């Protein structure tokens, strides 16, 4: 099991290779990363048998930026018939697993395998259970089968608590018809990724206030309003009338980069298309100057050296807060609903929080 297999957004295979190579160097795990363009996946092949396991034990998956999912294991070839027997034979040295996910890569070829996986899962689950290799137990490893085709599969393991919360790392979020734009799903996914679900009532509630910079027409504002917050929407463009009719939104025609609230707010969100360094500096200022307690800001990525640029900006933000003596939790992820961008979440840890009713 010396290969670490990772899913990603098509076109970002190189960023995954760079990021995982950085991690391997930090953890002294020898090996090499490889990927083909536009395949929506990458691998890190370890020279030592326990290398992939050491990578996974040494890193919280949620803190990786570009990988959507990961698993340690190996590829196997499957015959046209009796695939299950071959899979069971290769699992002889696998531990008993607590859950089973069948996955495909996020490409057109991968999506064509979805129906096959749906039909195959039932018989495979039954066979694994009968062989004593699968039980219902979240404390045990998750068995992840990623099909590259009907004849090739990556047989992998991952800790259910240290891997993606959805199969392939793709959330199943329903677009709310009342929201004025599909960008609303970006902020909802960000909350799922950065905020544990059992903390939503404490950190996203109706006694809170928020600011949406570059708000029009209101996709992100809608998420704040849906949690009952009072929102100041900053944009020179028009906001959706349905949002204004809620009575929870104040729309100010102003520049998102120069606006500052008169009183501190709980949340600042921003999806302005601008150079990433400028958005990062604004994010650091809002948190550092105490204008907000938590923030979600998108950083649009350059055409080249995307991982290097994100890493540089995150280090600059972290160094800035360290110099100020401010305690901040910093997260960054390329979400499923992101395109040529990543989403940053910052939470100031040394200020009092608003209490839910």
From Swiss-Prot:
InterPro entries: RlmM_FDX (IPR040739), RlmM_THUMP-like (IPR048646), RNA_MeTrfase_FtsJ_dom (IPR002877), rRNA_MeTrfase_M (IPR011224), SAM-dependent_MTases_sf (IPR029063). Keywords: Cytoplasm, Methyltransferase, rRNA processing, S-adenosyl-L-methionine, Transferase. GO terms for molecular function: S-adenosylmethionine-dependent methyltransferase activity. One of its GO terms (biological process) is methylation. The active site is at 300 (proton acceptor). One of its GO terms (cellular component) is cytoplasm. It catalyses: cytidine(2498) in 23S rRNA + S-adenosyl-L-methionine = 2'-O-methylcytidine(2498) in 23S rRNA + S-adenosyl-L-homocysteine + H(+). Its EC number is 2.1.1.186. Catalyzes the 2'-O-methylation at nucleotide C2498 in 23S rRNA. Monomer. Belongs to the class I-like SAM-binding methyltransferase superfamily. RNA methyltransferase RlmE family. RlmM subfamily. This is Ribosomal RNA large subunit methyltransferase M.
């Amino acid at each position: 099991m010396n290969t670490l297999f990772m899913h990603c957004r098509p076109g970002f295979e190189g960023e995954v290779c760079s990021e995982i190579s950085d991690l391997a160097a930090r953890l002294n795990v020898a090996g090499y990363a490889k990927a083909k363009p536009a395949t929506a996946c990458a691998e890190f092949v370890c020279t030592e048998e326990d290398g992939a396991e050491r990578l996974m034990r040494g890193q919280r998956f949620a803190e990786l930026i570009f990988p959507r999912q990961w698993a340690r294991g190996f590829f196997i070839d499957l015959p046209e018939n009796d695939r299950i027997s071959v899979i069971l034979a290769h699992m002889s040295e696998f531990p008993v697993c607590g859950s089973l996910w069948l996955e495909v890569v996020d490409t057109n070829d991968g999506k064509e395998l979805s129906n096959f996986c749906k039909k195959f899962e039932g018989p495979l689950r039954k066979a694994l259970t009968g062989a004593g290799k699968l039980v219902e137990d979240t404390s045990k490893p998750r068995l992840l089968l990623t099909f590259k085709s009907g004849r090739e599969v990556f047989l992998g393991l991952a800790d259910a608590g240290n891997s993606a919360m959805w199969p392939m790392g793709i959330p199943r979020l329903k677009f709310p018809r009342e929201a004025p734009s599909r960008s609303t799903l970006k902020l909802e996914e960000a909350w799922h990724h950065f905020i544990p679900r059992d903390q939503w009532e404490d950190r996203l509630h109706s006694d809170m206030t928020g600011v949406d910079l570059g708000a029009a027409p209101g996709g992100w504002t809608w998420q704040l309003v849906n949690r009952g917050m009072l929102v100041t929407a900053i944009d020179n463009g028009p906001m959706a009338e349905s949002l204004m009719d809620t009575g929870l939104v104040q729309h100010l025609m102003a520049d998102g980069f120069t606006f500052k609230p008169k009183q501190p707010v709980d949340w600042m969100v921003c999806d302005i298309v601008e150079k990433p360094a400028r958005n990062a500096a604004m994010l650091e200022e809002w948190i550092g100057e105490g204008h907000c307690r938590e923030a979600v800001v998108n950083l649009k990525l350059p055409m080249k050296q995307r991982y290097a640029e994100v890493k540089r900006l995150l280090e600059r933000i972290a160094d800035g807060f360290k110099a100020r003596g401010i305690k901040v939790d910093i997260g960054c992820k390329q979400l499923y609903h992101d395109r040529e961008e990543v989403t940053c979440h910052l939470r100031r840890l040394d200020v009092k929080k608003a209490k839910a009713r």
